[in-house]
Design a protein with these regions (language model features):
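Internal, active-site/partner-interface "lid" segment
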Residues: 152, 164-204
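S-adenosyl-L-methionine/SAH cofactor-binding core of RNA-modifying enzymes
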Residues: 62-121
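SAM-dependent methyltransferases
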Residues: 1, 83, 190-223
Length: 223
């Protein structure tokens, strides 16, 4: 069973999506264990403090390193095991960061082979850089934009990983035909009934029954 840990200051964001496919299927089929780790449980004081003002000035608050470190200690048991995980070939500690390398299908395939991944989700104005420097195997971004936190990007990334598990999708072979599955192209346009909609027709070749021509059409219309 693969293991995924989601460290966040807003774990409730995950609760509803995890009740839906493919997360629900992965959990029910014991293909994955998904743990929600609430940073508030590791606050530095009785007021629930997990953030602080940025040194040097700036707008907003930064997640402090101590709560994240305490959460990692709880997950792995010791500094040594945290560092072992950081450099492991079968496990990763990943920080969601808009400045990180962009996520893609090849990375999804790579991550789908790992035994355990811990995602550290930023919130507010970000995470103290020392968390990245000390504990992160790598940083990951969904693209050149900024979200309010790393929770939704983490869900997107986790979904791309889980749906590559043959135990999760009803038709695992479908992933071999999807966009970016075997190369850098996107899938061809898709059509269903009715054959005509607002004067637009389904391409005749798709209705022809000629499998060779259909295959050629699909290939030539992939981008």
């Amino acid at each position: 069973m693969k293991k995924y840990n989601l460290i966040s200051a807003q774990t409730r964001i995950f609760e509803s999506p995890l009740k839906e496919r493919p997360f629900k299927v992965a959990i029910e089929k014991k293909a994955a264990e998904i743990n929600l780790v609430n940073l508030r449980d590791y606050a530095i004081d009785s007021y629930g403090t997990i953030d602080g003002k940025p040194f040097g000035g700036g707008v907003g608050m930064i997640l402090r390193p101590e709560p994240i470190y305490s959460a990692l200690l709880d997950l792995y048991g010791s500094d040594e095991k945290i560092l072992d995980t950081k450099v492991s070939s079968t496990k990763k500690i990943v920080v969601l960061d808009p400045a990180g390398p962009k996520w893609n299908q090849n990375k999804a395939k790579e991550y789908s082979k790992l035994e355990e991944i811990t995602f550290i989700c930023g919130r507010y104005e970000g995470i103290d850089q020392r968390v990245v420097d000390l504990f992160a195997s790598e940083t990951v971004s969904l693209g050149e934009f900024v979200a309010s936190g790393g929770e939704l990007p983490a869900l997107v990334i986790l979904e791309t990983i889980l749906r590559l598990d043959e135990n999760v999708l009803e038709k695992p072979e479908a992933t071999e035909l999807e966009s970016y599955s075997n190369d850098s192209t996107t899938e061809h346009p898709q059509y269903t009934r009715p054959e005509e909609f607002k004067n637009l027709l389904v391409p005749k070749v798709l209705l022809s029954g000629d499998h060779k021509k259909i295959k050629e059409w699909k290939k030539s219309n992939s981008k």
